């Protein structure tokens, strides 16, 4: 059981160091499931009055017992080469999230561009769908989002670090 206490300064490197300590102690295998204990926080994760369109922004990550790297992740959105095609998203492999793009690429200088907006729809288990449109551009658009399920995120990071250390 991995108990998380809501420490907002916890980083992936801290989890890696913890796993290295297990490895040094001779742990090679964990019998059963790795459980993430977030019971220290048993209340609502959103306050009354929070603007709904801020909930996916990094500064608005839900309060959680399991926080790793501020429960924030970054992606790059690339416009398609051809107007009308779907833009694509690159997510670093070390982020245990899934992103889907429904973003339509507009021609550079398109009159629609002034009305073009992006929106993100969070789903279960840290799955996100990016919608809207993006004018063609030569450089990717950097974006950052708040993790919505801290326990799932922390658990996936812990499992990845255990696997990397050879602990099965």
Question: How should these model regions be labeled?
Answer:
Residues 1-168:
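Conserved serine DD-peptidase/penicillin-binding transpeptidase domain
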């Amino acid at each position: 059981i991995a108990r998380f206490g809501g420490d907002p300064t916890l980083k992936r490197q801290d989890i890696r160091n913890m796993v290295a300590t297990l490895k040094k102690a001779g742990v090679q295998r964990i019998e059963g499931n790795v459980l993430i204990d977030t019971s220290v926080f048993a209340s609502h994760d959103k306050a009354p009055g929070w603007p709904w369109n801020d909930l996916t922004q990094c500064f608005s990550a839900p309060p959680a017992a399991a926080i790793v790297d501020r429960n924030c992740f970054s992606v790059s959105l690339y416009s398609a080469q051809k107007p009308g095609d779907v833009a694509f998203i690159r997510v670093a492999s070390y982020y245990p999230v899934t992103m889907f793009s429904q973003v339509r690429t507009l021609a550079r200088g398109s009159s629609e561009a002034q009305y073009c907006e992006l929106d993100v729809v969070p789903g279960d288990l840290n799955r996100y769908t990016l919608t809207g449109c993006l004018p063609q551009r030569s450089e990717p658009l950097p974006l950052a989002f708040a993790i919505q399920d801290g326990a799932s995120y922390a658990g996936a990071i812990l499992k990845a670090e255990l696997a990397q250390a050879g602990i099965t």
